[in-house]
Amino acid sequence: MSAKIPRGAAVVVEAGKVLVVKRYLRQGASAECVMCEYGDVPGPRCDGHRYAVLPGGHVEAGESAAGAALRELEEETTLTGAVDRLLWTGTHNGRPAYYFLISDVDGVPELSGDEAVEHSATNHFELRWADAADLEEFGIYPAALRQHLTRLIEAGDDAG
């Protein structure tokens, strides 16, 4: 059995809000849908999922999780920045996940990369600034992040 590819994620906090990617995903069959698989959705059909994630993605060969977080942040949002520190570790769809606070953020967030190209009626992406209440409403995923992000927002930690 091969090791699961880790995920690096960028935590960008500004003015009491965190940048998230709101998503709607629907596949034809639940067997084709990663959210059905990890959400234990029964049945043959995928009815669709509305949720939000932090900008991030898989760690490429020879890349660190921090490097992946910065690369994915730029690819998905056009923002650049620097890693301030590792905030948390966890899992995302059954693979290791590393969450980094990003500082010295430059630019205006704009949906880009695959998230902009793959926009469709069954695969929709939207960048949003979320406060603590929004995290629940948007369905932050993985759900364990909500508590961590809420504490970070309430502490006013935006890494400058």
Predicted feature residues:
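N-terminal strand-loop-strand
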Residues: M1-V53, G81, R85
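A generic membrane alpha-helix/interface feature
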Residues: C33-M35, L73, P96, A144, ...
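Unchanged
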Residues: G57-A82, W88-A143
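Residue-level detector of intrinsically disordered, flexible termini
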Residues: G8-A9, E14, E60, S64-G67, ...
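Charged phosphate-binding loop/patch that engages nucleotide di/tri-phosphates or the phosphate backbone
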Residues: E137-G160
